[in-house]
Amino acid sequence: LKNRGVVEGFYGTPWSHEVRMSLIDFYGKFKMNSYLYGPKNDPYHSCPNWRLPYPEKEAGNIKELIEACKRNRVDFVWAIHPGQDIKWNEEDYQNLVNKFNLMYDLGVRAFALFFDDISGEGTNPVKQTELLNRLTKDFVKSKGDVAYLTVCPTDYSKLWANPTPQGSLAIYGETLDPSIEVFWTGDVVCSDLTPETLDWVNSRIKRPAYF
């Protein structure tokens, strides 16, 4: 597997900074190469404050996590979860770019967008792909030292994914920049990796799923 690591993307009490630092050493020891930071209860990752900069203390913690990842040869990926209240307009696009630039200044060089577990206009896959493609052009490629984007789609499990050509996964496959990786959890939220589920999703997103 190209990506071997951990996604901190759960609900409830997030890990403490000390636990995260210890786990990064663990990842390095056991040859993991990716730590994706996206705890749902981090208000500056998700609603209501994803548009705002991290306070000084929290920003310092992010820097320490990045340095720990470098020491352990682990890619630090910072995720944002804007979908519950994002507006598909220029103002919120610039809010997102501004937040990415703030995180870039902290040392982040790999980014992810989560559109999971949301409702309302944020679930629109056409708007999601337009946003991701524009970010790839305006931010990732213009920086020159930022890794490809990763996205968690609203339909991240076969359990509720729309399998038709009008479904979000098929729209991703037809319109999403091929450099962007797409999360997939399998037949259910926590499931085994099987050839059948990979064939099912890969044929729709037209790329190998990020599992």
Predicted regions, residues:
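A general structural motif
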Residues: 3, 32, 73, 108-110, ...
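Catalytic-core regions of glycoside hydrolase
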Residues: 9-10, 118-211
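Short, Lys/Arg-enriched charge-dense amphipathic segments
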Residues: 58-65, 99-109, 134-136, 167-181
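Short, conserved phosphate-binding/catalytic loop or strand-edge motifs used
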Residues: 109, 115-117
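Feature activates predominantly on carbohydrate-active enzymes
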Residues: 1-99, 105-109
